[in-house]
A protein has these predicted regions:
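Internal maturation/activation junctions in enzymes
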Residues: 153-156, 166-212, 217
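Contiguous, well-ordered alpha-helical segments that form the cores/surfaces of helical PPI scaffolds
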Residues: 136-140, 156-161, 186
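Short acidic, glycine/serine/threonine-rich loops at helix termini
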Residues: 129-134, 161-164, 196-200, 224-227, ...
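A short core secondary-structure module
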Residues: 211, 215-236
C-alpha cells in the first residue's frame, strides 16, 4: 500500500466516524508546529524525501500523515484514556481470559482500521517505508494520547523481527501475524533483572522436536494478554 492510499483510508475512517454522529473529544493536544520544526527545519529530513527508498514520500505527504494522526490522537485514541487508566484490564481466573475496556477496544480499532500498523510492517508484507524520524514523530502523538494503543499495536513491529531475523518457520509466523493482526508480547524483565537485561537468569533448552523448554521467571510482560486479537506471539 502506498502513502496516498494509507492517508485516504485513515481520512475516510475519520469521516465515517463523524458522519455516524459520534462525539470526538479527548485530553490530548499535539503541538504539530513543534514537530514540523524539529523534523524539517532543525533536522532537515525533507532532504532525504523523494529519493531512493523514500521516492514516493514528499514533505506534503509527510505533513498530511502528521496532521491525520494528530486528529486521530486528539479524538478517537484519547477518548478511552481515562477509562482505560481507571479500569485497566479484566482478568477472569476461572477461564484465564483477559479483556480490555470496550472504549479502549474502540480506540485501538480506529488505529488499526486506519492502517497505521503498515508503518511497522516490512514492505515485503504490505508495509509502508518511511524515515524513522517521521515514524517516531507519529508515535509521539499516539503515545501522548494513549500509550496503550501504541504498545498493543507493537505486534507488527515484532513481526519485523521474526521476518528479518527468524528461521523459515518463523518467517511464516511473521506473515500470519500481519495477515491475521495477531498481537505480540516482549518478555524481558525478571525479579532481579529490570533494565539490566544482561542479569537475566532464565534459560531455554531446545528439545528434539524443535520446541524449547523455558526455565525461569518473567514478569511485567508488555501487552501480555488481551482480547484484541485471536492470538498473541510471545517473544522471550
Amino acid at each position: 500500500m502506498n502513502l496516498h492510499m494509507l492517508l485516504t483510508s485513515s481520512i475516510l475512517g475519520l469521516y465515517l466516524h463523524v458522519l455516524g454522529g459520534d462525539q470526538l473529544m479527548g485530553h490530548y493536544t499535539a503541538n504539530l508546529r513543534d514537530i514540523e520544526f524539529c523534523l524539517f527545519e532543525l533536522l532537515g529530513r525533507d532532504e532525504i524525501l523523494g529519493k531512493s527508498i523514500y521516492k514516493d514520500l514528499d514533505r506534503d505527504t509527510a505533513m498530511g500523515m502528521l496532521e491525520e494522526i494528530k486528529r486521530l490522537s486528539e479524538n478517537d485514541l484519547a477518548a478511552s484514556f481515562v477509562e482505560g487508566d481507571r479500569m485497566g484490564v479484566d482478568f477472569n481466573p476461572a477461564t484465564g481470559d483477559v479483556k480490555v475496556p470496550a472504549s479502549f477496544k474502540k480506540s485501538y480499532n480506529s488505529y488499526i482500521e486506519g492502517e497505521w500498523w503498515r508503518l511497522d510492517t516490512p514492505p515485503e508484507l504490505g508495509g509502508t517505508k518511511i524515515p524513522a524520524s517521521l515514524r517516531w514523530a507519529i508515535a509521539e502523538m499516539v503515545l501522548g494520547s494513549n500509550p496503550s494503543v501504541h504498545i498493543y499495536a507493537s505486534g507488527y513491529a515484532f513481526a519485523q523481527v521474526a521476518y528479518y531475523l527468524g528461521t523459515d518457520e518463523q518467517k511464516k509466523i511473521a506473515k500470519l501475524m500481519i495477515e491475521r493482526h495477531w498481537g505480540a508480547s516482549m518478555m524481558l524483565t525478571e525479579p532481579d533483572a529490570g533494565s539490566d537485561v544482561g542479569a537475566g537468569r532464565a534459560k531455554a533448552i531446545q528439545q528434539a522436536d524443535g520446541t524449547w523448554h523455558i526455565i525461569g521467571t518473567k514478569r511485567f510482560i508488555t501487552s501480555g494478554d488481551s482480547d484484541l486479537g485471536e492470538n498473541i506471539v510471545h517473544f522471550v
